[in-house]
């Protein structure tokens, strides 16, 4: 591991701030994870898998950083740009606002935002048809349900997650016109992506109302959804990456966005 890599991977914690060691410029690509970290078993981990696949197959190296809070976004992005990383890939829509400001300052750097859109000549925006995949798992949920009630638990209450919810509900109704679809969002702040305890609470609430298949599109919060569904002997549906192995026999299926492929291609 290079000195630059070690320095960057140690940039964690708001009190310490974000600062690079005294190293030379590098041209490796960089990946900045969203809140929740690269081992969230969902969106971020899918991005990490794509980066690792790229490194393994090409023999290349890349820089990475995990954030602890929103305040670190601008510093992390600016430091990578100033030290020559190219391209710089950001996992998650929440990078949009800071990227809109910084991208024009570094016209020779290619930026890639996954799951968001920024209109700039040096920015590649990668988005998915999440409503279509959600439609398919909605059909599967309704077909597997014995109670006639299925559930959806989203992360942050934003239009992106509403598309997951709408696609899921429409798919469920397409398979069973009489199905009841319950829906909850975890919260309105970025913390909603990494709150498995709250995810479990919402899951129990839906189970109490009759849901026997529950789809989680909530990042790390979904880990709590899947665990609680397993404990209650009902089905869950994973998202972003294949989560079936987390609870074999309990996770009905997973809706893959192939964030890993997007990351691999971006590098």
Language model features by range: what are they?
Residues 2-14:
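Bacterial N-terminal signal peptides that target proteins for export
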Residues 12-22:
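Bacterial N-terminal signal peptides
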Residues 27-267:
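A residue-level marker of the well-folded mature domains of exported/periplasmic proteins
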